[in-house]
């Protein structure tokens, strides 16, 4: 187990009654609030009106930034920064999933900073000195952004999708009501399940192998996600299933499962250029890339993948080598993603052309910790295998 420092200051209100705590949280901040959200779904479900009523009852002046898309763009961040500076925003309230939250985080650290937020934080990785307070009302369990200090932003002009970490990007509070997920389309739920599983696997399938508590927690989280996903797909309003999906996605990135691990984010690093270049849904891209990546490193990571097969998928090890167990575990993962959930299985199905592979490899961060350090040629081969 490696040395670590653990810190997570997010106050979480979880449950069917979680929204009742919004007024008390709003009372802790100043009068000017920037409300951020995506498309029209929160208006169709009535959530927008509930939030607006709470803001008005709290005496807040509300300014809005709507239309935040999946793979949130730099353009929306710039727009939000301008609104924050113009109206002297005291609190950003993000209502939605990871895209809305990440865009809001980038705005939170970008608005008080001098210079261009992209160059300052996402290219030069300068440390943020302060940030506008952020609150979250989660509607899509997927990214875990409601409990972490990271924000992923896409620059379509350069074809880059980069991540920035800062303690000023931790939300001050997060409201997690599983009933808010009942109306999600199946494809959004599936993408969220895949993203959560990918986070858990990247934390777990990484050295060292002697971090027993963290690894056991990760295995339990993966088994929970799989079981809850199967129930939720059959019955979208199964509260216990939705509650477990929501809490597992948050738990995956709250920092607990990083403790003592080096972590291997290579699948995310390969997928990010696909989203940046072709606007691929993040979870859909991971459903294709992550199993192919595990197949590629299977021999190097055989002991860990064999444990993954036994303890997560229930593979019987009798008479099988670690390599054979590992392959059966990956096969079980692919069946879950592609057959049970119906997630895409190939890059071709996502509309990604084979001609882009060299460019994707060029944009892929190869600095991740792994059982097998990749080169650009390795990335190209992985992409070919899942085409």
Positions of PLM-derived features:
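Glycine/serine-rich anion-binding loops at beta->alpha junctions
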Residues: 89-105, 139-145, 277-280
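Short Gly/Thr/Asp-enriched flexible loops that form oxyanion-binding sites at enzyme active sites
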Residues: 51, 81, 100-114, 147-148
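ATP/NTP phosphate-donor binding region
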Residues: 1-91, 347
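A glycine/threonine-rich phosphate-anchoring loop and its flanking beta-alpha core
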Residues: 10, 20, 112-216, 307
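Active-site segments that bind and position negatively charged phosphate/pyrophosphate groups
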Residues: 203, 207-332
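C-terminal charged capping/lid subdomain of soluble metabolic enzymes
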Residues: 312-387
